[in-house]
Regions:
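N-terminal, positively charged, Ser/Thr/Ala/Gly-biased leader segments
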Residues: 81-105, 201, 213, 218-239
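A glycine-rich beta-to-alpha transition motif near the start of alpha/beta enzyme domains, typified by
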Residues: 81-195, 246-360
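Membrane helix-loop-helix hairpins that form the core translocation module of multi-pass transporters
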Residues: 194, 198-206
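Peripheral docking tails and interdomain loops at the edges
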Residues: 7-81
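Short glycine-rich anion-binding loops that position phosphate/pyrophosphate groups of nucleotides
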Residues: 21-26, 92, 146, 206, ...
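Selected transmembrane alpha-helices and immediately adjacent juxtamembrane segments
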Residues: 236, 244-247
Length: 360
């Protein structure tokens, strides 16, 4: 009976790991081999050591998971930690740890990100940005969310990386090009006493095609569509700014319990890659109030792509004008967005909080 139940659980898709604790006898090993083969066919990890299983349980209980845990070669471990120089930077309160990784020193950004972004035991931040070599731009940016997952695109982070490059003479002129998300972004710099104090980036095309957002809903686009999330009805507009966004216009932004509603949106089944959920109110035709619950981060003080998404949705629905600056007010400050022919332009102030060295 127990053998049948084990196979039924494996077939149900509810099992992520199999831990074998049976005796090493011929009859039990044959049963394990058969179970092991079936589990592997369903892409289920099989563990044969209680120590390994306990270590995995500790990992799953912590903020680490199978996507951001570093595999270490025990035969070739480093004898000492190396030093990573970083800059802690912010744009309207969304803060990133910016690291020059042109030498390829960071081997597992996902694991580094989880520890470094912890606001109690690390530097603290909404994510990390690695600056790397590029053949097609001044530099390449790879951004990771606080949980170690790849961020894809981040508008505020682009502005901060541009400031980092200019202020350290890693790029010259009044414009910086950054390779990010498979595209090259152009960032115009505004200087005070030779340092970048604000910047403007062409965020590129606003994408509404569901397959490219992605969102698993029918139709050529999802605009002002009524859907059910957490047993409540919401009118949503889904789009991509290089990462997936879902925008909902509400009467009272401050009244929302984002710690409850946010995860329901982020992990809804219609979003195969999760989603950044924006909750907006149009104050007037040139001002939007916005809160964003980011995938992998939770609610943040600001979100550049989220501001672009909210402005684009407002223009799409005729709530705000095209080709005009729209002030997007977020908990951490203001961002300026302009939508022109389904392209988004983001402007924001940039600042460095401090520099330091991480033991890595």
């Amino acid at each position: 009976m127990y053998k049948r139940q084990a196979y039924e659980l494996i077939e149900s898709g509810k099992v992520s790991y199999v831990v074998y604790t049976g005796a090493l006898r011929d009859d039990t090993m044959l049963e394990y081999i058969a179970l092991h083969r079936r589990a592997l066919a369903k892409s289920i990890a099989c563990l044969t050591s209680l120590d390994t299983a306990n270590a995995l349980a500790d990992i799953l209980k912590s903020r680490y998971n199978e996507r951001n845990t570093e595999l270490v070669d025990l035969c070739h471990m480093r004898e000492a930690r190396s030093e990573l120089h970083f800059a802690k930077m912010q744009c309207a309160g969304t803060d990133y740890i910016v690291i020059d990784n042109r030498n390829g020193q960071v081997s597992c950004a996902e694991s580094l990100c989880v520890g470094a972004c912890d606001r109690h035991f690390g530097v603290g931040g909404d994510g990390i940005a690695l600056i790397e070599q590029s053949d097609i731009a001044d530099a390449k940016m790879r951004m990771f969310n606080r949980d170690g997952s790849p961020g894809g695109m981040a508008g505020g982070c682009l502005l901060l990386v541009a400031k980092y490059l200019h202020d350290r003479a890693l790029a010259a002129g009044g414009e910086v090009t950054i390779e990010a998300g498979g595209d090259v972004k152009r960032v115009k710099l505004f200087l005070t006493d030779g340092k970048v104090t604000s910047a403007r980036v062409d965020m590129g095309e606003v994408v509404y095609e569901p397959a490219r957002v992605p969102v698993a809903l029918p139709g050529s686009e999802v605009v002002d569509r009524l859907i059910e999330i957490g047993r409540r009805d919401f009118r949503v507009t889904c789009l991509s700014m290089g990462n997936p966004h879902c925008v909902t216009f509400v009467e009272r932004v401050d009244a929302l319990d984002l710690q409850v509603i946010g995860p329901l949106f982020e992990n809804a089944g219609i979003f195969p890659e999760r989603v950044n959920a924006g909750f907006a109110r149009v104050v007037n035709e040139r001002m939007i109030k916005l809160r964003v619950y980011e995938r992998g981060n939770g609610e943040t003080l600001a979100c550049g792509t989220g501001a672009c998404a909210a402005a684009a949705a407002a223009v799409k629905l005729g709530k705000c004008p095209e080709g005009e600056d729209i002030t997007v007010k977020l908990p951490g400050g203001d961002l300026i967005v302009r939508i022109e022919r389904d392209r988004a332009y983001l402007t924001g102030e940039t600042a460095q909080a401090f520099e330091g060295v991480l033991a890595y």
